[in-house]
Every structure is written in structure tokens, then in C-alpha cells.
């Protein structure tokens, strides 16, 4: 599938600032499920950006503005061809050992209830078991828009029985740890047929299975990633995989608008 993506993030500030710095994980990389034909980021400071690949294989740009305006617009766009691999990515080009993803964060720390759910689907076949985990999470945690916030943990969302894609991914990561399976948070895009505009950035998870390598799972949609998905970055949880992380020296409030448009090209 040939997809054209345009992802614009607009920050509005109440008052001018004296310094702003952003770390961007907005550039997707080639992998067995996608080929990135072109990709560009437009933002103040991109001409002097520091660009590097971090230990998890993410393409990162570090930009800054010495005298930032009251509005900051960051636009990422490009063309990607995707293939349905059943979610299987295998061994990717990254320095990190998969076992580091057995380490919990505050957002992916498990609970007695999550551990019990994970134990209830313990099976001898790891792939079958992780599929069962995905189904159990989707069944027990309903997708409800605006039912959580950026700081909601896996344990809190599971106890509430509601969440969004971020919460489903965090719970999945915590549940996999109960079976000693490394799992991580993934950000990217999901193309929805008959929808010209995506609601927002999407998130899912990946589990590392000894015979397959990294395999994607999207509990929010009860499926493994298909050719409708474009993988952008990964991390231990939502904050560590966020597409934009920034700081600004400013006394006023911040207002954020995100617009994502994904179109299929014939």
C-alpha cells in the first residue's frame, strides 16, 4: 500500500519565550513492513538540527530556537510503501538488547489484577499466548476516548476498565513481563479506509519472541499491524517514544493542535 502522510503539530504560547528545544522522533525508518521513499520535517531550527539514531533504532532530530515566536509549527510529511507481514518485523538494526524492555517504568508497572489476567492465558506456545493476551486486554479494557490522560498508568487504566491506545499498549507491556517476554511501546500512523483524516497519532506495542523477533500487537484494534500501519518510533512507554518532546523558557500557557492526514495513493 502506498501512503502519503502529513503530520502537523502547532503550539501556541501565551507570551514570547527566550529559549526552546525540541527532540523529534518524527521520521520513520525502513523495516520489513515498510519502505520510506521520502520524508521531510519543516520546523524552525531544522537547518541546524543535530541528527542521530538512538540505541533503540529511532531517527532523532534535536532542534532549538534562541528567540522562539509565540507560535511553533512542526510539519512532518512523506511517502511510504507498506506490506502486511502479519506484524512480524524480526531482528531490527538497533543496539539495544531486547531484555532491557523487561524493565518496568511508572506507566508500565504491573498490578495484581494485570498479573492475574496474564496468568489466565498462560499457554505453551508464546505466539499463541501473546495473541491471547491482546484479546484479553481488548475484552477487559474498553476503548473510550478521553477516558485517560498522559500520566495514566497501566494499573490505573486496567482497574478503570477503560482507556485509549496508549493504555492498551502499556497494559500489554506489563502483561508480557509476567511471562518474561520483552515488550515495548510503538508510535506511528494507522490509515483508516474512507477516512481522509486520522484523529491523532496512533500507538501499539511489540513483543520479542525467540523464534520470530519483534512482532507488533495492537490491542486497541484487536489485531497485529497490517499494511495500514506506518511505524515511527519505539520506547519503554509513551513518553520515551513520543514524537515530540520539548521544553521552553516561557511564563505563559501552552496550547496544542495536532492534525494528521493519511491518504492512499493508487
Predicted regions and their residues:
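Structural beta-strand/beta-sheet cores of well-ordered domains, especially the beta-sheet scaffolds
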Residues: 1, 7, 22, 39, ...
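Linear, non-domain "peripheral" regions
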Residues: 1-116
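A broad, low-specificity signal for short, low-complexity segments enriched in glycine/proline
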Residues: 1-4, 32-41, 144-146, 164-169, ...
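Noncatalytic linker/hinge segments flanking ATPase motor cores
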Residues: 46-53, 65-67, 81-84, 114-122, ...
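Secondary-structure boundary elements
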Residues: 89-90, 96-163, 171, 179, ...
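Hydrophobic/aromatic-rich core segments of domains that either
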Residues: 135, 167-252
Amino acid at each position: 500500500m502506498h501512503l502519503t502522510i502529513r503530520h502537523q503539530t502547532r503550539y501556541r504560547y501565551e507570551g514570547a519565550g527566550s529559549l526552546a528545544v525540541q527532540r523529534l522522533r518524527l521520521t520513520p525508518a525502513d523495516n520489513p513492513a515498510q519502505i520510506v521513499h521520502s520524508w521531510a520535517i519543516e520546523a524552525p531550527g531544522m537547518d541546524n538540527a543535530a541528527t542521530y539514531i538512538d540505541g533503540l533504532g529511532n531517527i532523532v532530530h534535536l532542534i532549538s530556537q534562541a528567540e522562539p515566536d509565540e507560535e511553533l509549527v512542526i510539519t512532518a510529511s512523506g511517502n511510504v510503501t507498506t506490506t502486511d507481514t502479519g506484524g512480524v518485523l524480526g531482528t531490527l538494526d538497533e543496539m539495544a538488547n531486547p531484555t532491557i524492555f523487561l524493565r518496568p517504568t511508572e506507566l508500565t508497572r504491573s498490578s495484581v489484577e494485570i498479573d492475574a489476567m496474564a496468568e489466565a492465558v498462560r499457554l505453551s506456545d508464546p505466539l499463541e499466548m501473546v495473541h491471547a493476551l491482546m484479546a484479553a486486554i481488548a475484552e477487559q479494557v474498553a476503548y473510550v476516548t478521553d477516558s485517560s490522560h498522559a500520566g495514566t498508568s497501566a494499573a490505573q487504566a486496567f482497574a478503570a476498565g477503560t482507556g485509549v491506545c496508549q493504555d492498551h499498549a502499556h497494559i500489554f507491556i506489563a502483561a508480557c513481563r509476567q511471562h518474561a517476554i520483552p515488550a515495548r511501546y510503538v508510535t506511528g500512523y494507522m490509515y483508516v479506509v474512507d477516512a481522509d483524516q486520522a484523529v491523532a497519532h496512533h500507538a501499539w506495542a511489540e513483543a520479542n519472541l525467540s523464534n520470530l523477533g519483534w512482532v507488533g500487537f495492537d490491542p486497541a484494534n484487536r489485531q497485529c499491524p497490517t499494511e495500514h500501519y506506518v511505524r515511527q518510533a519505539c520506547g519503554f512507554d509513551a513518553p520515551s517514544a513520543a514524537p515530540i518532546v520539548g521544553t521552553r523558557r516561557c511564563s505563559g500557557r501552552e496550547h496544542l493542535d495536532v492534525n494528521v492526514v493519511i491518504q492512499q495513493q493508487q
